[in-house]
């Protein structure tokens, strides 16, 4: 007999007093379908036309890289779904400063790009129709939003929205969505902000532009329990294992809680607690000497195959194999599908 996570009254409101107190006004949401004890979703960040090669990446190369590994997993596990967090016009070359002298000068370093960046338009999705078509034909895959350029001035290069006002965030999101409109690439109304960081300006802009959910927090260290809260990367104070409403119920938050360095027992503990096992990967393993521990290479692919197989054997059909977009749809508008064609509003 399948088990469900303990029910929470729909009207419950939780207000946590932190530096993000306005963002953290929200509460639990009834998110699991009847008959499911827990859920699993998988997402990949930093998807863009230059994955593995900032100058060029042919479709044949895509089949051999991260997206090839994803396809292998999708073939092996028919219930698996994936969210590809895709950047509209990727400009990042290095995620860490390479202009080391400038990076040591206070004030000045905050006003300059501390690494070379790609010219605007180099990796614009609409300039790479073969890449867009490749994404469109992937089975059981949805597209999520992952920023406009994935860069900012200052030492924290990927954190694109960190210093922007609400108006600047709105303009950036609108330009990002306009690029998706050029391609006709459908996307789910969810954002994974580059560098995980979220601000009140960004949440206000998300609400204004029709984005319904955000995946800001990542925590791979906090022990699993029904009361555990995220306290690592990005937004702190949100639930570690349950989808949760924030911003007065206007946005849904989803925490990433498992990656390549996590033990299988962590995945099992999340399922036992009736939570959402939100597995994260990055599209590129090594960039400019920086290695992503969760880069989706063959080793990580094989580990995920082991994790998925073990969970299938232990829990069978009691797990909801879902996606961040499907959870957003269920929680924020009650429909089975909430995929937007770029340029539309829900």
Whereabouts are the PLM-identified features?
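Active-site beta->alpha N-cap acidic-glycine motif
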Residues: 8-134
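C-terminal domain-boundary segment and adjacent tail
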Residues: 20-25, 32, 77, 213-217, ...
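Metal-dependent polysaccharide deacetylase catalytic core of the NodB/CE4 family, i.e.
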Residues: 83-199, 223, 279-291
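Generic enzyme active-site microenvironment
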Residues: 43-44, 144, 280, 321
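Active-site metal-binding loops of divalent metal-dependent hydrolases
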Residues: 45-47, 147, 283, 324
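Loop/turn elements at helix/coil->beta-strand transitions in domains of secreted/extracellular proteins
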Residues: 77-83, 138-142, 185-187, 210-212, ...
């Amino acid at each position: 007999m399948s088990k469900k996570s303990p029910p929470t009254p729909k009207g419950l409101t939780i207000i946590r007093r932190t530096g993000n107190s306005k963002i953290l006004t929200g509460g639990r949401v009834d998110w699991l379908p009847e008959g499911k004890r827990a859920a699993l979703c998988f997402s990949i960040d930093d998807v863009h036309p230059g994955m593995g090669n900032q100058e060029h990446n042919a479709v044949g190369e895509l089949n051999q890289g991260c997206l090839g590994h994803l396809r292998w997993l999708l073939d092996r596990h028919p219930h698996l779904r994936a969210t590809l967090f895709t950047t509209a016009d990727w400009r990042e070359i290095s995620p860490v400063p390479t202009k080391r002298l400038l990076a040591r000068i206070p004030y000045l370093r905050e006003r300059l790009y501390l690494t070379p960046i790609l010219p605007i338009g180099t990796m614009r999705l609409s300039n790479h129709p073969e890449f867009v078509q490749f994404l469109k034909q992937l089975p059981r895959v949805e597209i999520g939003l992952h920023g406009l350029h994935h860069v900012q001035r200052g030492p924290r290069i990927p954190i694109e929205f960190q210093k922007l006002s609400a108006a600047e965030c709105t303009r950036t999101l609108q330009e990002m969505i306009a690029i998706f409109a050029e391609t006709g690439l459908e996307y789910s109304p969810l954002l994974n902000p580059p560098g995980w960081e979220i601000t009140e300006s960004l949440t206000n802009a998300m609400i204004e532009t029709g984005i319904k959910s955000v995946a800001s927090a990542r925590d791979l260290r906090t022990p699993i329990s029904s009361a555990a809260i995220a306290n690592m990367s990005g937004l702190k104070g949100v639930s570690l294992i349950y989808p949760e409403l924030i911003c007065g119920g206007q946005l849904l938050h989803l925490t990433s809680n498992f990656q390549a360095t996590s033990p299988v027992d962590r995945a099992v503990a999340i399922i036992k607690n009736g939570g959402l096992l939100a597995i994260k990967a990055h599209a590129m393993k090594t960039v400019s000497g920086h290695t992503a521990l969760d880069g989706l290479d063959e080793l990580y692919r094989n580990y995920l195959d082991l994790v998925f197989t073990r969970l299938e054997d232990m829990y069978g059909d009691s797990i909801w194999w879902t996606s961040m977009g499907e959870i957003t749809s269920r929680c924020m508008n009650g429909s089975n599908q909430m995929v937007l064609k770029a340029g539309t509003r829900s």
